[in-house]
Curated annotation (Swiss-Prot):
Known EC number: 3.1.26.3
Subcellular location, record wording: Cytoplasm
Catalyzed reaction equations: Endonucleolytic cleavage to 5'-phosphomonoester
Protein name: Ribonuclease 3
HAMAP family, alphabetized: RNase_III (MF_00104)
Superkingdom of this protein's organism: Bacteria
Molecular function as annotated in GO: double-stranded RNA binding; metal ion binding; ribonuclease III activity; rRNA binding
Oligomeric form and interacting partners: Homodimer.
RNase III domain segment(s): 5-127
Domain DRBM intervals: 154-223
Amino acid sequence: MKKNVTELYKTIDYIFADQGLLEQAMTHRSHKGQHNERLEFLGDSILSFVIANALYAKFPKAREGDLSRMRSTLVRGQTLAEFGLEFGLGDYLRLGPGELKSGGFRRESTLADAVEAIIGAVFLDSDIERCGELILSWYEERLNAISPGLNQKDPKTLLQEHLQARKLSLPGYTVVDTKGQAHNQTFTVECIVDGMDSIISVGSSRRKAEQKAAEKALKILKNEP
């Protein structure tokens, strides 16, 4: 891998006993050698089970349809890609020359697949209990925020849909400042929307800062206070 994995271990909060599993999880099918598709398959199933179980316990009165919608929101590719960005997986992915040249290290589907592959690798490296604990620690913020019956779309998605409906360019997000150590950082994000002044927001994670910025932009576009 291009970077030392020590920082990645800190970011995902797990140290592999078998580093080969992590290397496989970070290997795209375009790269020579054993790639991550089998681990992705395994991780996808484990993630779905862990999140379904957590939602079932958290919302004892929720209907099946609401539980399914919440699970879909939490395990969809967009959510997993957000984790991939937060973890900085693009710096560790092993890609073939063509995929690397085309920017595969930042492609949403590639990042999402890598997150699922890491989950599969963690399970094989430990057990279902440790793997489940890790997944729930990653998802703590999102599980606390979600509720049955509510619109499951987050501010970034709503802003994107608002702009697309008006045939406008999609927003851009840039981290302009990061302070603090891993697990205790503050991120400053700039959101750029055509025709608007740039919007600056701060959050304890890149995702939080981006969501705050998107929410501000949406309110301005809708002329809300």
